[in-house]
Amino acid sequence: MKRYPPRPPRSARTARRPRRRIPAFHPVPVGKRHDGWTPARQVAFIGMLYETRSVVAAAKAVGMGRESAYRLRKRAGAAGFAAAWDAAMGFAVAPVRLHQAKCTGLPAHYRMRAGLMQVLVHKGCFAGLLTKPDNSALLQHIAQLDRHLAAERMEAWGG
């Protein structure tokens, strides 16, 4: 009589890997250079990091160095980029409130112009990038301009 090992529990057989969702982020503000960290290159780096889970391989895939990637992550205003990095590596990510300048360190006018970058992933592979307008940053910028204009009017009236 043949003896077969016991079957694993149903939950172990059908268990899937949890899907890693990369949050949208504002690109880190850097100087304009054709060979530097452009917003598209930042998104491509996060996408390749999602695929490879290797900082060295992802940086090499986008034509940059490992050290410069870590420097970019430590820059001011890189909170969203760092959260996307952590999500791509599979770490638990605390949500970043992208609409608050105190959390991101980026002014509303920059967030409005740059927009939100979303990494597109299809079947576990980097598929491209999607740029979304940041409407909350637009509304914050308009409110700031309105307050500034109201303050100027009060000064003009001698108040």
Question: Model segments located where?
Answer:
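N-terminal, charge-rich alpha-helical recognition modules
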Residues: 1-152, 156
